C-alpha cells in the first residue's frame, strides 16, 4: 500500500541510485521500472544499516510472502538485476514485485499491478535479512 512507511538503508539507497543512473544511460526500455523504483525510494524512511528493524525487507533479504487471493506461500530473495534468477527464487529489484516489496515489514500487505489486475501479498516472515545477520555490505 503506497501510504505505508517503508524503510530503506542508506547503503541500499546509494547502490540503488547508482544502479538507476547506470540503467538510465543504457536501457531505455526499463524507464517505467526505474521510475517506479525511484518513486519508492523517494517515499522511504532512510535508516542506517545498523539500525534497520530486523523485520524489514532490505536488498538481499529472503522473505516468505502469502498471496492474499490464492493463499499460496512464496519465498523470494530480493536482489540486484545482475543476480536475478527465477529458478532460484531470486527476484530483481526492477521487477514489479521486487520494487513493490522493498522496505516493507513482516505483517505488512503490499500490492502491484499485473496484466490482469492487481496482486496483493502479505509479508509472512523474513528468513534472512543481511543487516540482522551482521552482513552490512551485501
Identify the residue ranges that each predicted region occupies.
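Short, solvent-exposed secondary-structure boundary/capping segments
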Residues: 87-90, 131-138
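Non-DNA-binding regulatory cores of transcription-related proteins
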Residues: 62, 72-118
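Residue-level marker of positions within ordered structural domains that often coincide
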Residues: 21, 68, 128
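Conserved hydrophobic positions within beta-strands
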Residues: 123-126
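Long amphipathic N-terminal alpha/beta scaffold segment
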Residues: 36-82
Amino acid at each position: 500500500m503506497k501510504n505505508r512507511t517503508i524503510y530503506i538503508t542508506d547503503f541500499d539507497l546509494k547502490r540503488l541510485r547508482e544502479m538507476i543512473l547506470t540503467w538510465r544511460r543504457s536501457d531505455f526500455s526499463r524507464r517505467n521500472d526505474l521510475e517506479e523504483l525511484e518513486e519508492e525510494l523517494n517515499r522511504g524512511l532512510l535508516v542506517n544499516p545498523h539500525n534497520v528493524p530486523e523485520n524489514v525487507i532490505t536488498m538481499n533479504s529472503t522473505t516468505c510472502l502469502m498471496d492474499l487471493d490464492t493463499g499460496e506461500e512464496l519465498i523470494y530473495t530480493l536482489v540486484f538485476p545482475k543476480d536475478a534468477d527465477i529458478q532460484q527464487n531470486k527476484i530483481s529489484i526492477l521487477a514489479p514485485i521486487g520494487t513493490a516489496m522493498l522496505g516493507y515489514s513482516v505483517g505488512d500487505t503490499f500490492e502491484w499491478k499485473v496484466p490482469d489486475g492487481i496482486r496483493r501479498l502479505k509479508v509472512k516472515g523474513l528468513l534472512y535479512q543481511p543487516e540482522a545477520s551482521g552482513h552490512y555490505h551485501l
